[in-house]
A protein has these predicted regions:
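N-terminal single-pass transmembrane signal-anchor helix
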Residues: 1-27, 32
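Generic detector of short alpha-helix boundary/capping microenvironments
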Residues: 15, 43, 102-104
């Protein structure tokens, strides 16, 4: 083999490796998107149970994505306090529920598969609460956000 042939083989292998890595990353993100959509559906069910029991949605009027962990913690606490919505919460995979920001006696937050706390927004006058995942870029209010609406 000549040096040129070896270089051609190395280039072909590098191109193939790049394609495989790119496809694997895309498949991973698609799986995470499906997971977060399923999570939002479970949380929607828990919110409906909460509403059926209390005749109201958990309030959280602040739209400030910097406070998403606090909003998520508030939602978890409210849903956990009602038996019917609590039973829905127990069906959520434990990998989405963590207590990263509080002490052991504070409620957990709800996280998406990328490790970002979900945001929850509901103000008086809204038709339905918004659950928002920041998506793969982990930045709220960007094109890849995933919501329950």
């Amino acid at each position: 083999m000549t040096l040129v042939e070896i270089l051609v083989v190395v280039v072909v292998i590098a191109v193939l490796a790049t394609m495989v890595i790119s496809i694997a990353g895309r498949i991973d993100n698609q799986g995470k998107e499906r997971s977060v959509k399923a999570l939002l559906a479970q949380l929607d069910a828990a919110i409906q149970e909460y509403r059926d029991f209390t005749s109201a949605f958990p309030a959280q009027p602040e739209k400030n994505f910097a406070n998403a962990p606090a909003h998520s913690e508030l939602l978890y606490r409210e849903l956990d306090a009602i038996p019917s919505s609590h039973s829905v919460l127990t069906k959520i995979d434990d990998s989405f529920i963590e207590n990263k920001y509080g002490t052991a006696d504070t409620p957990s937050e709800i996280y998406d598969p990328w490790g970002t706390a979900l945001d929850y927004i509901y103000a008086a006058g809204d038709n339905y609460p918004a659950l928002i995942s920041a998506g793969a870029d982990k930045v709220f209010d960007s094109a890849d956000d995933i919501t329950n609406k």
